[in-house]
Amino acid sequence: MTLLALGINHKTAPVSLRERVSFSPDKLDQALDSLLAQPMVQGGVVLSTCNRTELYLSVEEQDNLQEALIRWLCDYHNLNEEDLRKSLYWHQDNDAVSHLMRVASGLDSLVLGEPQILGQVKKAFADSQKGHMKASELERMFQKSFSVAKRVRTETDIGASAVSVAFAACTLARQIFESLSTVTVLLVGAGETIELVARHLREHKVQKMIIANRTRERAQILADEVGAEVIALSDIDERLREADIIISSTASPLPIIGKGMVERALKSRRNQPMLLVDIAVPRDVEPEVGKLANAYLYSVDDLQSIISHNLAQRKAAAVEAETIVAQETSEFMAWLRAQSASETIREYRSQAEQVRDELTAKALAALEQGGDAQAIMQDLAWKLTNRLIHAPTKSLQQAARDGDNERLNILRDSLGLE
């Protein structure tokens, strides 16, 4: 049995290839059935995200194994083999185990240390459990990777610092306000970045969020998810005074929030401070706003400096994480080797028990026919001894003929001979 990990990711393949190799959720069962129909495959898990498509397999060794699996992947997706080979990586046994642990821990992600990948790996594993998982070693490898990912997050600072613009914006807000549960947040825009910001804020117990967007329909979908109120962009001037925090990310070519608008809001708030985080490019907030007393304006460049600093911290934590992965990989491979020995022991014991049962049955039959009990028992003992020592004796003789002293010593040790 061999463990394999093969696939492509954001480091080896452009998005144009990654999207062609991805497995859609509605066809995943079909793909797993097709994969497990391959004669060499004993068990399989398919991990398919926007940044990677990987197959984790338990296989029987055979000639042209790599070619057979690449051919299956190309046939399934109707790809040219040469196009795929240039971007494909292939890991076996120790390297496959280490790779999965690194992936689950966020060490192989586009955003170093990002936590979402662990959930994606867990889902891929759960999907494979629906009648597709046939290899206990593969199952154990995934379970081990989950515990390793948890250990990495617990024992290192890999996830402690923000390295995405959305997360950095929320981290900044948490640093300035003692508690986010009592503040009102105005989100301007409803795109992907604002979606991430809104979800982060909800996780930090923000009770009141207002979403201002050009189109109400898109904003309403997000508002329903996070429990926010939706307003039009034209209502910002009137509602701005309610907001303690404003986070803006639109595609507007011109600023949406001007200096005069913020001045009026501050006056209505009796100069209670406001935090404005402008993630947009071009900017949504006029730079002059930053000159106002009690208005604290941060641009995407300010966030980028925070992210760069935090990324350096994550890279330092990643070194510690790699040490954990190496240690856990070594322990898993030791367990795997022990499992291999256990199977050999089971086969050897089963073989011995089969000989015992066969000879005992013959002896009992002879006794039932009235044979001499002492002679029958002596014959049983003699035959049982000869049958059990036959194979080891042949191995000892062959090692002696070959002059293989190392093998002779191993056999002597195995047989308990001094």
UniProtKB/Swiss-Prot annotation:
<comment type="pathway">
    <text>Porphyrin-containing compound metabolism; protoporphyrin-IX biosynthesis; 5-aminolevulinate from L-glutamyl-tRNA(Glu): step 1/2.</text>
</comment>
<comment type="subunit">
    <text>Homodimer. Interacts with glutamate-1-semialdehyde 2,1-aminomutase (GSA-AM), which forms a metabolic channeling between both enzymes to protect the reactive aldehyde species GSA.</text>
</comment>
<feature type="active site" description="Nucleophile">
    <location>
        <position position="50"/>
    </location>
</feature>
<dbReference type="GO" id="GO:0008883">
    <property type="term" value="F:glutamyl-tRNA reductase activity"/>
</dbReference>
<dbReference type="InterPro" id="IPR006151">
    <property type="entry name" value="Shikm_DH/Glu-tRNA_Rdtase"/>
</dbReference>
<dbReference type="GO" id="GO:0050661">
    <property type="term" value="F:NADP binding"/>
</dbReference>
<keyword id="KW-0521">NADP</keyword>
<dbReference type="InterPro" id="IPR036343">
    <property type="entry name" value="GluRdtase_N_sf"/>
</dbReference>
<feature type="binding site">
    <location>
        <begin position="49"/>
        <end position="52"/>
    </location>
    <ligand>
        <name>substrate</name>
    </ligand>
</feature>
<feature type="binding site">
    <location>
        <position position="120"/>
    </location>
    <ligand>
        <name>substrate</name>
    </ligand>
</feature>
<keyword id="KW-0560">Oxidoreductase</keyword>
<keyword id="KW-0627">Porphyrin biosynthesis</keyword>
<dbReference type="InterPro" id="IPR015895">
    <property type="entry name" value="4pyrrol_synth_GluRdtase_N"/>
</dbReference>
<comment type="function">
    <text>Catalyzes the NADPH-dependent reduction of glutamyl-tRNA(Glu) to glutamate 1-semialdehyde (GSA). In the absence of NADPH, exhibits substrate esterase activity, leading to the release of glutamate from tRNA.</text>
</comment>
<feature type="binding site">
    <location>
        <begin position="189"/>
        <end position="194"/>
    </location>
    <ligand>
        <name>NADP(+)</name>
    </ligand>
</feature>
<dbReference type="InterPro" id="IPR000343">
    <property type="entry name" value="4pyrrol_synth_GluRdtase"/>
</dbReference>
<dbReference type="GO" id="GO:0019353">
    <property type="term" value="P:protoporphyrinogen IX biosynthetic process from glutamate"/>
</dbReference>
<comment type="similarity">
    <text>Belongs to the glutamyl-tRNA reductase family.</text>
</comment>
<dbReference type="InterPro" id="IPR018214">
    <property type="entry name" value="GluRdtase_CS"/>
</dbReference>
<dbReference type="InterPro" id="IPR015896">
    <property type="entry name" value="4pyrrol_synth_GluRdtase_dimer"/>
</dbReference>
<protein>
    <recommendedName>
        <fullName>Glutamyl-tRNA reductase</fullName>
        <ecNumber>1.2.1.70</ecNumber>
    </recommendedName>
</protein>
<feature type="binding site">
    <location>
        <position position="109"/>
    </location>
    <ligand>
        <name>substrate</name>
    </ligand>
</feature>
<dbReference type="InterPro" id="IPR036453">
    <property type="entry name" value="GluRdtase_dimer_dom_sf"/>
</dbReference>
<dbReference type="Pfam" id="PF01488">
    <property type="entry name" value="Shikimate_DH"/>
</dbReference>
<dbReference type="Pfam" id="PF00745">
    <property type="entry name" value="GlutR_dimer"/>
</dbReference>
<feature type="site" description="Important for activity">
    <location>
        <position position="99"/>
    </location>
</feature>
<feature type="binding site">
    <location>
        <begin position="114"/>
        <end position="116"/>
    </location>
    <ligand>
        <name>substrate</name>
    </ligand>
</feature>
<dbReference type="InterPro" id="IPR036291">
    <property type="entry name" value="NAD(P)-bd_dom_sf"/>
</dbReference>
<dbReference type="GO" id="GO:0042802">
    <property type="term" value="F:identical protein binding"/>
</dbReference>
<dbReference type="Pfam" id="PF05201">
    <property type="entry name" value="GlutR_N"/>
</dbReference>
